[in-house]
């Protein structure tokens, strides 16, 4: 998988068996800091089958007791489970092979000739890594574990491919709302001192 922190690797080891038991796959796991940490998990049904909010809710319910028991994040945090969306992240070996011919953005964990960020078209994937034809017509080959970020670029061709695969809602106007989020606040309810409302 793409480069993870030690904490993210620990979290992945906890939630991945839950996802597999439900016939799902973890696409990306990320912990974002701030006043309240945010644990973001993107997942899809095995094999890239169309995934909906019910799948996310089921996965979230399955993961919550596991995370609560292990307590991998010591402070209050928010858990978000969502589908990858159209301009999905590419994080695992094999992800690039599914999207040959589509535009991609990549950020490497370590720079090549002083450069870390690249944009181009996926031309293949093999044991050496993903093959990308860059916008300047040069070529890049990089393994997934050498990347810190990678995602598809939203184009008309990508939207059509997602529609054909059944990964778009029936209403065209909903293209930008493709993520099916299911959020759980892992902290106790708090009262707003100004309004008295429970948050």
Curated annotation (Swiss-Prot):
Chain segments carrying region Disordered: 165-199
Keywords per UniProt: Cytoplasm, Ribosome biogenesis
Domain of life: Bacteria
Compartment list: Cytoplasm
Any matching Pfam family: RimP_N
Main location: cytoplasm
Sequence ranges of Acidic residues compositional bias: 172-199
Keyword Cytoplasm: yes
GO cellular component terms listed in the entry, alphabetical order: cytosol
GO biological process: ribosomal small subunit assembly; translation
Family statement: Belongs to the RimP family.
Function: Required for maturation of 30S ribosomal subunits.
Protein name per its UniProtKB record: Ribosome maturation factor RimP
Organism per entry: Hyphomonas neptunium (strain ATCC 15444)
